[in-house]
């Protein structure tokens, strides 16, 4: 893992931030068997691709942190791995890796489908209201994902 971050730091000195983020999307997607455009679409919808974005507006008192808007509910588990809120705000590739791991957990639970994508934002809880929120979020991701795929062609 240290080798990966060393390469990212080296690349950041040689390339623009957009190209470094492209490396981050690809690296995380490869590690978790995801599409890089899906991760980028999530980051775009979640934070507007802002590395230091913080959202304090969650109804349950949690906050969302960084590029991938990692919910603070994950911090106790992440802290055991040496991942702090400050690192999520200052290391965009780390935010992408953590976001990809969270999405991969939902995919493992629900399959590679829009329920898993919607759970990234809304959580997996039951109920028709939460299901509607998951669906609405997944539709926003789908629109952005399609635009990214079209750009690639």
Regions found by a protein language model. Give the residues of each.
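Sec-dependent N-terminal signal peptides
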Residues: 4-14
């Amino acid at each position: 893992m240290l080798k990966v971050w060393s390469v990212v730091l080296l690349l950041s000195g040689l390339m623009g931030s957009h190209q470094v983020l492209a490396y981050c999307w690809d690296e995380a997607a490869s590690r978790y068997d995801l599409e890089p455009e899906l991760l980028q679409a999530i980051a775009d919808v979640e934070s507007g691709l802002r590395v230091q974005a913080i959202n304090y507006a969650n109804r349950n008192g949690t906050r969302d942190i960084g590029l991938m808007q990692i919910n603070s509910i994950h911090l106790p588990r992440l802290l055991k791995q040496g991942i702090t809120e400050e690192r999520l705000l200052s290391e965009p590739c780390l935010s992408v890796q953590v976001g990809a791991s969270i999405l991969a957990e939902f995919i493992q639970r629900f399959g590679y489908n829009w329920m898993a994508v919607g759970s990234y934002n809304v959580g997996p809880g039951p109920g028709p209201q939460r299901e509607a929120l998951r669906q609405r979020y997944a539709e926003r991701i789908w629109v952005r994902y399609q635009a990214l795929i079209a750009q690639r062609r």
